[in-house]
Amino acid sequence: VRYDDYRSATTDYLQNGDKTWISQDRVTKRFGALYAFENGISPFISYSEGFKPISPQGTLTSKEVKPTTSKQVEGGVKYLLAEYATTFTASVFNIRQKNVLSATPTWDYRQTGEIESKGAELSIVSRPADNVTLIANYAYTHAINTEDETYEGKRPTQVPENVFNLWGDYTFDNTPLRGLNVGAGVRYTGPMEISPANDKGKLGGTTQYDMAVSYRLGEAIPSLSGVTLKASAQNITNKETFSCYDDNNCWIGRDRTVQVGASYSF
């Protein structure tokens, strides 16, 4: 059980410094259960509620604005193939969101009555060797506006029907490169609606590639034991991507991004 109490004050300097006060609170619940059989099969179920405060935006006044709330039910089964250190997970889910904030073609904001998302997820996590990890995920989502004066029955924007991720990494052991870890992956995001009215076509699906490398310095310099250097790159081919609230509100996605850093473990 969780309790959120959100309060905010907004000052409009274009309207003589008028202030708008918002107070929103909610108690949310979450629980789950899993039973592990000796044969490696583990059915599970979970329920969770969400709460997201929303502040006045555009012509959406403090009297009209409501927090976004959600309820999610998920159930599935895990299967551990111990001999191959591999876990398979399959699940189905249903999510209902109320009062979702969305942009309008007139550069304003409104709140959608209810959006229902239901679908299925599949994932595999495997360690075929002590120094090898493979991860694959796939999700199918059918999302639709179920309560809305304008867009009822339409698919919301920014929600792809299909998403797929694949990642693998390898750690060098018992070689001159001991302490070095390299990884690579691919991400696929399916087509998405451009307009909430579903009348402007779709953004095409995109495929992006990522890489990562890290090195434990202590393997080469014992006095630096605990220090790890890291570098990662997302969208290494610099694939151009887009996302849209509607046909008047679109933006370019993140270009190739490289990050470097270091960490120390005590």
Language model region names:
Residues R96, L177, R187-S195, Y215-F266:
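C-terminal beta-signal and adjacent terminal beta-strands/loops
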Residues V1, P43, T86-A90, L134-A136, ...:
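Transmembrane beta-strands of outer-membrane beta-barrel proteins
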Residues E38-G40, L81-A85, N131, D173-L180, ...:
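Short loop/turn motifs that connect adjacent beta-strands in outer-membrane beta-barrel proteins
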